[in-house]
């Protein structure tokens, strides 16, 4: 049984990839999948032409296809980008990645996980439709350490597993998420 679990984990890790890249011109809205078009990721900034790019600790965001499937199980008609994630993924357990984990996207892009989850100060349309929103609990964020070009279908590789800390993230941002998690409000 242990060997089966190991093989399954190995298979999933070897299949880890970006299934969709999504951008938006402004914050607070769903992002639009860009299809197969290669996208430029700028160092210490994020996805070119995306509203969330900038000099802060949440330059890019990730959400697993499994999270979208759970939302669909709740009766929502959602797809890639609908939770405003930049990268929709499969084959990698995003919630198992501690802060500081470094991910290689494609051949060149290097991202460090800077925040797990987020506090929603204003409830989004999805929350009002379903009474819940998965992204605050299941979305993760990163800062871009090395830029480059990525496309849907590119591999995701864990380059270095983090130790649970990230120097790019303000302590108050982490404290806010942790307080909400403990209070059960994420």
What are these regions (language model features)?
Residues 150-155:
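Short, well-structured beta-strand-loop connectors
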Residues 76-86, 124-139:
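Short, basic/aromatic beta-hairpin or loop at an interaction surface
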Residues 2, 6-110, 115-118, 149, ...:
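Electropositive, beta-rich accessory/interaction domains or terminal extensions
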Residues 89-91, 139-146:
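Short alpha-helix capping/helix-loop boundary micro-motifs
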Residues 131, 146-149:
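Extended, hydrophobic interaction surfaces within ordered domains
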Residues 122-126, 168-169:
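A short, polar/proline- and glycine-enriched secondary-structure boundary/capping micro-motif
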Residues 130-134, 159-164:
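Short secondary-structure transition/capping segments
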């Amino acid at each position: 049984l242990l060997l089966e679990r190991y093989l399954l984990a190995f298979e999933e890790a070897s299949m880890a990839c970006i299934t969709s890249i999504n951008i938006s011109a402004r914050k607070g809205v769903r992002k639009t999948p860009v299809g197969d078009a290669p996208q430029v990721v700028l160092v210490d900034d994020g996805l070119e032409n995306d509203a969330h790019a900038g000099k802060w600790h949440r330059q890019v965001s990730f959400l697993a296809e499994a999270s979208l499937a759970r939302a669909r199980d709740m009766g929502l008609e959602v797809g890639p980008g609908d939770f405003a994630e930049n990268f929709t993924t499969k084959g990698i357990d995003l919630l198992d990645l501690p802060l500081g984990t470094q991910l290689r996207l494609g051949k060149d892009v290097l991202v460090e996980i800077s925040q797990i989850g987020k506090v929603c100060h204003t409830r989004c349309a999805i929350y009002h439709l379903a009474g819940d929103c998965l992204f605050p609990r299941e979305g993760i964020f990163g800062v871009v350490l090395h830029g480059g070009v990525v496309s849907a279908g590119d591999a995701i590789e864990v380059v270095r597993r983090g130790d649970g800390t990230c120097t790019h993230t303000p302590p108050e941002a982490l404290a806010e998420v942790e307080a909400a998690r403990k209070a059960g409000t994420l």
